[in-house]
Structures are given as structure tokens and as C-alpha cells.
């Protein structure tokens, strides 16, 4: 069979001509291997680069149940592109998934990432993955694999998207599902580090309206740094707390804020009544509310308002839990109590 004829003056095309640089992808793998190596832990059976990532469930688990989570960083990335600041969004990516699986009582074991772009910038991608590895170190899980997809025409130059996948394990008898929460239990709030990774479409709209100087000082750091502060990872302090006392329920305060996330762990017939004066509204949220003219109710269902994780314990355990978490470096407040739901009432109310 004769090969197809090409025009005499035509040159053969390569993948690079089509916009995909295999050499850049290889260079990125070489750059990120040291970051991934720092996250290695017991259970990892291979390095980065295989078709599949291997992990052996630790033998300490008698009846392990795997808990998985996946998430992205949302439109916070648009602000990262605008600021050319890529060192914190990797931690955001890890936090969004590991904090989610933590609320079931799971210890995060491993993490995989997906980085998609139109044209691969090796230095930018390496900066992002370094942040991912740092997030994995903070949560004690291994970065054991990932995918970098260079797709010409799919994303504008200088932009990318991220997705993360976390898998953890919990002893079957120790799954936390909120089923034991009862009237009189106490809701503790752990401080957030800032906006975390939700509500940024509204944040960007407020910035568009207010047109602030993002490099200006904002309570000791630039406004840009305050807006981009990475999502706090609560894994190690809360896993330690679970070894000492009974944690009945937890809620990662993400999209939907306090009023839509706490109900996810409450049985029907129970309401969490939160006292909005029980914790201080951080200056960044005051700034957003003032410059956006955002109503209180909207703030509570879009932003975390200074509380990144809610933890529900018995009243008898509340003081011990606060002391333990404070010693571990967390800021904690008693922000509410659990009571019977009144007719026509939501499962979380802020008073």
C-alpha cells in the first residue's frame, strides 16, 4: 500500500505544531517529583509516573471503610490569574477535598490532581503542584498521582483549571454521620483563614464594583493576599481530637455557608441555633459586605463568615474540645446549640 502523497512544499506536522509540547510535560514531571516525594507515607507502593497509583490500606484498620471526595477551586482561579499568584491555590485544592472526607471521621490517605490548560507553562504548573504537595503534607496524605492535560484552544493563554481527588479511611465502627446528635449538644466553630474557596463569583463582582487597590495594606498584608489566603486544613487537630472524645458531627463550611452546610449532618427534627455575636466577623467579610451591600442572610449562605469548620459535641465535652483544639493552634468558639426544630423552621438559624 502506497503512503498518501502530500503537496511537494508541505512540511510534516508534529504534535508541537498542534500546540502540545510533550517535552514541557516531561519537564514538569521532573520538576514536581521532589514535591511529591516529600508527601510519601506508609502505604504508598510506587512513585509518580505509573499508569495507576498503588496504595495499601494501613494494617491498623480492622474494618476499613474508604471515603472519597473530589472538588476544585472554583472562580478563585480567575483572581489568581489576574494577580499572577499561583502559590496558594494548590493548598486550596487539597483542603476542599480532605476537609470534606474528614467530616466522616476519615484519615486522608492519598490525593490525586488534575491540571488542565491550553498551553502548558511549566513554571506556573510547578508552582501550583508545589502548593498541592504542601497541602498534602499539612493533611498527612500522599500525592501519588495526577494528570496534566494540555489542550490547545480549550483555555485562554495563562489560564488553567484544577480538580482534586482525595481518598481516606475510617474504621467502620467510627464513621461520623451525625446520627447521635441530640438536643442540648454544642456547636463549636473553628476559625477560617479567610474566604477559603467559595463565593468568589460574588467576591469578583464586589471587586469590580469597588475597584480597590489590591496591593494596598489590609490589616497588615495586602488586600490581594487577604483575598487569596489558602483554605485552612483542619485534618490533624480534628483527627487528634477524635482520639480523645466523641465528635458527633462535623460540617465543612463551603458553598452554602453555615446555614446550608450544618443541616447536612443533622437528623430531621433538629435545628442548630447559632449566635452571630458568639464569634467576631473578620475584617475581610466586613469589607465585602460593606462594598457589596450584601445582606446578612446572603452573607450567611454564601460565605463562611469566619467559621471554616463546625464541630458538634455533647455539652459535657465542649470545654475539653475547645481546650484541646486551642492547644493545637486553632481558634475556637461556642457558636450555637442544637435544639428541636420549631414548626416551619430551617435546620440552621442564625440569631
Curated annotation (Swiss-Prot):
Pfam families: AIRS, AIRS_C. The keyword Ribonucleoprotein does not apply. One of its GO terms (cellular component) is cytosol. Transmembrane segments: none annotated. Keywords: ATP-binding, Cytoplasm, Ligase, Nucleotide-binding, Purine biosynthesis. It is found in: Cytoplasm. This is Phosphoribosylformylglycinamidine cyclo-ligase. The lineage of its organism: Bacteria, Pseudomonadati, Pseudomonadota, Betaproteobacteria, Burkholderiales. The gene is purM.
Amino acid at each position: 500500500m502506497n503512503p498518501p502523497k502530500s503537496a511537494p512544499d508541505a512540511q510534516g506536522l508534529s504534535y508541537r505544531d498542534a500546540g502540545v509540547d510533550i517535552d514541557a510535560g516531561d519537564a514538569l514531571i521532573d520538576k514536581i517529583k521532589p514535591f511529591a516525594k516529600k508527601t510519601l507515607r506508609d502505604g504508598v507502593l510506587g512513585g509518580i509516573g505509573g499508569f495507576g497509583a498503588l496504595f495499601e490500606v494501613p494494617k491498623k484498620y480492622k474494618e476499613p471503610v474508604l471515603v472519597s471526595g473530589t472538588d476544585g477551586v472554583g472562580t478563585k482561579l480567575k483572581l489568581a490569574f489576574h494577580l499572577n499568584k499561583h502559590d496558594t491555590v494548590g493548598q486550596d485544592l487539597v483542603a476542599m477535598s480532605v476537609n470534606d472526607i474528614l467530616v466522616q471521621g476519615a484519615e486522608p490517605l492519598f490525593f490525586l490532581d488534575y491540571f488542565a490548560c491550553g498551553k502548558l507553562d511549566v513554571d506556573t504548573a510547578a508552582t501550583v503542584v508545589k502548593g498541592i504537595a504542601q497541602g498534602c503534607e499539612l493533611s498527612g496524605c500522599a500525592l501519588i498521582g495526577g494528570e496534566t492535560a494540555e489542550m490547545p484552544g480549550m483555555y485562554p493563554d495563562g489560564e488553567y483549571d484544577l480538580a482534586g481527588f482525595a481518598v481516606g479511611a475510617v474504621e467502620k465502627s467510627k464513621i461520623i454521620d451525625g446520627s447521635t446528635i441530640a438536643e442540648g449538644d454544642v456547636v463549636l466553630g473553628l476559625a477560617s483563614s479567610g474566604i477559603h474557596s467559595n463565593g468568589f463569583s460574588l467576591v469578583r463582582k464586589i471587586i469590580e464594583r469597588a475597584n480597590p487597590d489590591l496591593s494596598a495594606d489590609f490589616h497588615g498584608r495586602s488586600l490581594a493576599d487577604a483575598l487569596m489566603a489558602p483554605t485552612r486544613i483542619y485534618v490533624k487537630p480534628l483527627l487528634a481530637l477524635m482520639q480523645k472524645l466523641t465528635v458527633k458531627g462535623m460540617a465543612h463550611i463551603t458553598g452554602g455557608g453555615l446555614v446550608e452546610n450544618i443541616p447536612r449532618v443533622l437528623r430531621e427534627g433538629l435545628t442548630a441555633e447559632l449566635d452571630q455575636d458568639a464569634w467576631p466577623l473578620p475584617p475581610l467579610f466586613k469589607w465585602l459586605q460593606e462594598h457589596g451591600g450584601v445582606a446578612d442572610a446572603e452573607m450567611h449562605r454564601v460565605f463562611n463568615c469566619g467559621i471554616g469548620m463546625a464541630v458538634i459535641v455533647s455539652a459535657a465535652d465542649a470545654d475539653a474540645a475547645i481546650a484541646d483544639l486551642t492547644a493545637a493552634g486553632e481558634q475556637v468558639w461556642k457558636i450555637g446549640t442544637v435544639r428541636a426544630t420549631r414548626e416551619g423552621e430551617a435546620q440552621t438559624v442564625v440569631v
